[in-house]
Amino acid sequence: MQFMFPLPHMLRLKATVQPWEASVTGADQTRMVKRAEELGYDMIAVPEHFIIPRSHVDLSGPHYFHAAAAQGYIAGATSRIRINSCITILPLQHPIVTAKALSTIDWMSSGRITVTFAVGWLEEEFKLLGVPFHERGRMSDEYLAAIIELWTSESPSFEGKYVSFKDVAFEPKPFQKPHLPVWMGGDADAALKRAARFASGWMPFLTRPEDFPARIDFIKSQPAFRGGPFDVSYGVATSRVGEGHKVNRDP
């Protein structure tokens, strides 16, 4: 078992954070991540959104980081602890840019990066960034395959609907081999199938602890599951007020 440090002021959700967290500065966070490393914590994970419509601020809060940028900063401020995302919204950035950002951080940190990808849920955010919301699942499948091709092939080549490349060079490759660990976030069946195909870990959001065995069995029963160790994260401090979120269909 490993432990993830819940760094304050990574987001501001009224239902789940303490009011004092809004006063935590970047300098405070830097001291905290260093102390978390000294205390033996194993991982820090960074949430991500790019832009929040005013109509969603009461639900989602206004304060989020660009996950890869924050991961890079935390990696530079520490020497041992692993830095994950929770989550990186895969369809909202070009996969070549995402692959480059993560391989750069992994290479420079000597292999301390994990990424948790998910397809996203906030339709208005997709509209603001010009990304087709109802194609996000298909885009994510293609983007994942393209990113792994860039990370692992000496002569990367990919042909798809949303991204294509050939006759290209891509370095640095990730420090970790064959590539940095990829986890999948989400609770929908499509997310778990994606985890079986592409990932070595799963970060659920709504799954109840008593349902974990069945969901893990579902992942491992998929034809694309490659076997081997498979990590699962669970936020024991997660709280919910009222009905809360529901799992949406992942196209």
Could you tell me what each predicted segment is?
Residues 8-10, 49-51, 88-90, 118-124, ...:
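Active-site beta-loop-alpha junctions enriched in small/polar residues
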Residues 3-5, 44-46, 82-85, 113-117, ...:
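Hydrophobic faces of well-ordered beta-strands that scaffold small-molecule active sites
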Residues 54-58, 91-198, 213, 217, ...:
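Internal, glycine-rich beta/alpha segment that forms the wall or movable "lid"
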Residues 77-80, 109, 196-203:
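Glycine-enriched alpha-helix->loop->beta-strand junction motifs that scaffold or abut catalytic
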Residues 23-36, 97-102, 184-197, 243-251:
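Short, acidic/polar
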Residues 1-20, 80, 122, 161-179, ...:
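N-terminal small/glycine-rich loop or linker at the start of catalytic domains
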Residues 1-77, 177-180:
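N-terminal beta1-alpha1-beta2 module of alpha/beta enzyme domains
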Residues 57-84, 139-150, 217-234:
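Alpha-helix-loop-beta-strand connector modules within alpha/beta enzyme cores
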